[in-house]
Amino acid sequence: MPSPHTNADGALSGSGTSEAASACPRPEKERERLWIVAGDIHGDASLLADTLAAVPELPRADGVIITGDISRAGGGIPSARAVVEAAEELCPVVLAQIGNIDQPQVDAWLDERGINLHRKAREIAPDTAIIGVGGSTFTPFGTPSEFPEARYAEWLKELAARAADHKRLILVSHNPPKDTVCDRTGSGQHVGSRAVREFIEERQPAVGLCGHVHEAAGMQLVGRTQVLNPGSLGSGGYALLRLGEETTLIPRRIGA
C-alpha cells in the first residue's frame, strides 16, 4: 500500500520524493494504525515535545497530525519549523496544516517539506484517506489565513473527489463545523464553518478533527461522524486516532 502522501496535483499517490513521505511505513492490513492528534500549538515547541513524550502510546505511533495554528502570531516559518522539528524528533512522520494564525508562507513551507494537509488528500492506512482544510472563516481579528465559506465548500468538494476510491475518510479542518460543542466560544457564540458542517452532513466521514476554538474541547456525533476538538495544546488537549477494522477516536488531556 502507498505511503501517506500525494503527487504534485494533490491526487492520492503511491510514490514520491519527500523525506517525510519516504519515512512513512507502508500500511499493512493486519496492523492497526495509530496517530496522535494535536493543534493550536502557537509556536510552543517545547510544550509539544513534552506532551508527545508523555503519551504512553508514542513508541508505536505511526505519526502526528497537527490540525493548525502551528506558529505563534507573527512567527512565520521559523516558529512553525521549531514546532514541526520538535515533533519529528520524537515521531518522524508528521502531517500538518495552517490555522488562521499561520502566515501564508507557512503553507508554502509545509508544501516544500512534503507534509502539508491543507487542500491535500493522502492515504494513511489501508483504504483510508485523510483530507485537510486549514485556516478559518473570517474572524474579528483579521488573522493571516482567513477564507470565505464558498472557498471551503469548493476545496472540500475537490478533496472528496480525490479521495472517492477510499472507503474510509478522515477530515482535518482547523475550523470546526458550525453549531457543535466544538465551535462554541466562552460567551456561547458558535463560530464554526457552515461549509464544513454541510460537508460532514453530506459525506459522513468517519472522523472530523478540528481546533481553532481553544475553549471548545469536546466530541459529538454529526450524523455518524465523530467530530472532535481536543482543545488547545496549552490546555493539555490531544487525541489518539486508531485506524483498524474500526475507527476509534480517544480524547486525552495531559495531567487529567
Predicted regions and their residues:
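Beta-strand-turn-beta hairpins that frame and shape the catalytic cleft
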Residues: 25-36, 122-132, 164-169, 221-226, ...
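A general structural detector for well-ordered alpha-helical segments in enzyme core domains, enriched
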Residues: 51-54, 79-86, 155, 192-199, ...
